[in-house]
């Protein structure tokens, strides 16, 4: 698969106005999103990526085969992405008390008595790292010398086992480097995914993925000015088809024209998106 992209920088004071404009353009309300993004670096030579490691056998076969083929072409940085909720930030880990265990045991095979209402749960929200879903996302360095004024690159993704992701990633030849969070809003316009977002840094560095997340006020924007990034992306299944790639590019140009009074969508610097592990 190929991914075609255009980007724009959005000043903080323009963020709300652009959200309203995108909502009107796409005829939908913004879908707010938080993501954890873990960065891993390859240390193993190409051709040695093993796609059958423990629980990873549950991963969709076709996706992983395609991803494995791309990863074997060289050594790259890659990212593991996991969706989270705003309530997950600052939430404690789940605990199972003796009372909870007794309740679970007594509830096995015993239904609630007729006419007795269950009391609504008053327990605080908890973040369970062991149940965190993950997706591995590979992005190649953008193609050089493309005639079209869009960023084009090979891409692939595959679902991963939930929970602790270090074991399968290390087994595939990847070391954990760092992680950050992304906050933003998504819009869909035909085949274009529009993501208006910003990068958030954690208050402290970690040598492995965090099992708990700090409170949101402790997170700091990468851009101290508070600016956002507008990303417009189209995924093309058959990147070898020049006609399909041309049509996708034209769709992005159409969006650029519609938003030209608000932002300047343009292709990114190729080397700034270089994912090769040196």
Swiss-Prot record:
InterPro entries named in the record: Mediator_Med18
Oligomeric and partner information: Component of the Mediator complex.
Keywords: Activator, Nucleus, Transcription, Transcription regulation
Function statement: Component of the Mediator complex, a coactivator involved in the regulated transcription of nearly all RNA polymerase II-dependent genes. Mediator functions as a bridge to convey information from gene-specific regulatory proteins to the basal RNA polymerase II transcription machinery. Mediator is recruited to promoters by direct interactions with regulatory proteins and serves as a scaffold for the assembly of a functional preinitiation complex with RNA polymerase II and the general transcription factors.
PANTHER family according to UniProt: MEDIATOR OF RNA POLYMERASE II TRANSCRIPTION SUBUNIT 18 (PTHR13321:SF2), MEDIATOR OF RNA POLYMERASE II TRANSCRIPTION, SUBUNIT 18 (PTHR13321)
Principal localisation: nucleus
Subcellular location field: Nucleus
Alphabetized Pfam families for the sequence: Med18
Protein name, UniProt field: Mediator of RNA polymerase II transcription subunit 18
Similarity-based family: Belongs to the Mediator complex subunit 18 family.
Gene Ontology MF annotations: transcription coregulator activity
One GO BP: regulation of transcription by RNA polymerase II
One cellular component term from this protein's GO annotations in UniProt: mediator complex
């Amino acid at each position: 698969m190929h991914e075609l992209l255009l980007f724009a920088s959005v000043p903080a004071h323009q963020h709300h106005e652009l959200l309203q404009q995108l909502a009107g353009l796409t005829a939908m309300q913004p879908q707010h999103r938080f993501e954890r993004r873990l960065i891993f670096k390859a240390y193993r030579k190409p051709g040695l990526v093993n796609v059958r490691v423990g629980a990873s056998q549950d991963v969709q076969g076709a996706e992983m085969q395609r991803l494995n083929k791309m990863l074997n072409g060289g050594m790259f940085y890659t990212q593991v992405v996991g969706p989270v909720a705003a309530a997950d930030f600052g939430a404690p880990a789940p605990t199972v008390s003796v009372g909870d265990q007794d309740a679970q045991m007594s509830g096995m095979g015993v239904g609630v008595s007729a006419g007795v209402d269950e009391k609504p749960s008053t327990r605080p929200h908890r973040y369970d790292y062991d149940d965190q879903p993950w997706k591995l996302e590979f992005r190649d360095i953008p193609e050089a010398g493309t005639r079209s004024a869009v960023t084009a690159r090979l891409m692939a993704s595959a679902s991963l086992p939930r929970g602790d992701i270090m074991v399968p990633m290390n087994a595939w030849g990847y070391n954990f480097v760092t992680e950050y969070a992304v906050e933003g809003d998504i819009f869909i316009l035909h085949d274009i995914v529009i993501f208006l977002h910003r990068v958030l840094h954690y208050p402290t560095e970690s040598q492995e993925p965090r099992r708990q997340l700090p409170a949101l006020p402790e997170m700091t924007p990468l851009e101290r000015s508070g600016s956002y990034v507008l990303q417009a992306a189209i995924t093309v299944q058959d990147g070898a088809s020049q006609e399909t790639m041309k049509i996708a590019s034209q769709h992005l140009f159409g969006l650029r024209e519609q938003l030209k009074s608000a932002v300047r969508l343009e292709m990114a610097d190729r080397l700034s998106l270089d994912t090769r592990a040196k």
